[in-house]
Amino acid sequence: MLTRLRALAPRALPNGWPDLVRQVLIFAAAYYAYRLVRGAVDGHTTAAAFEHARDIIGLERSLHLFVEPSVQAWGETKPWIIDFASWMYVNAHLPLMIGSLIWLYIFRNRSYYFIRNVFVISMGIALVGYVVFPTAPPRLFPEWGFQDSVSNFIGFNTDTASTTSSLVNPFAAVPSVHVCFALIIGISMSRLVRPKWLRFAWSLYPLLMTFVVIVTANHWWMDAVLGALTALVAGTIAQALLARARPNKWAFAGARI
């Protein structure tokens, strides 16, 4: 058994233990800093968040694209859809992201560092959005017919729980990092796996997550668009600046296995 583990170690740890520890620390530090800044809420932020959300509603109505109430109302008529979407929002987003990053690190190590950089850059861009444009999500506007689908699904009010944690900000809606991260992972995995059905499934994942965040009233569709734009900008920066600076280490290697 020990011999077998030693034989597997070079593949599981393509750059050795020090690099693995370094990657874990980078993500842990970036994520904690992201959550800490993201969780900064005060009275001014709360007032501004609702005002910004009303501005979004006004803009979407002027474009005749205020579709979020209709999307959720349709989902609520089909309990299995709203329950599945709520489950996806709570349980699938983070495990899929972490699992994909682990797979990339082990099996597509040459591409992992580029994707890592895109994630870290996108977190930084998202934090700017949360500070500059705090926005209340649709679920906080029952007057428009919205329900908190996720709270109904898990059995307690997530916004009430959020007020007890300095790491949670109910007004961190713009951009949608659920959509941003889903797009980063979805595009990356669709280019790095071999089975056609799996490539197709990963390519649909960002669209699925966009539907999930809207039907559960956690984001406006404009949040989702800005989340996708955040991923695009982060990818452009990672390619134009970082990958050029260290092409042998930080460039994307798109070969499938």
PLM feature spans:
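N-terminal transmembrane-helix/juxtamembrane module of multi-pass inner/ER membrane proteins
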Residues: 2-95
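Alpha-helical transmembrane segments of integral membrane proteins
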Residues: 14, 18, 22, 26, ...
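Alpha-helical transmembrane spans of integral membrane proteins, capturing the lipid-embedded, hydrophobic core
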Residues: 23-35, 94, 98, 119, ...
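Aromatic-anchored segments of alpha-helical transmembrane domains
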Residues: 32-36, 123-131, 204-215
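Hydrophobic alpha-helical transmembrane segments
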Residues: 87-102, 178-186
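Interfacial helix-loop-helix junctions of multi-pass membrane proteins
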Residues: 137-144, 169-173, 208-234
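C-terminal membrane module of polytopic membrane proteins
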Residues: 203-204, 216-257
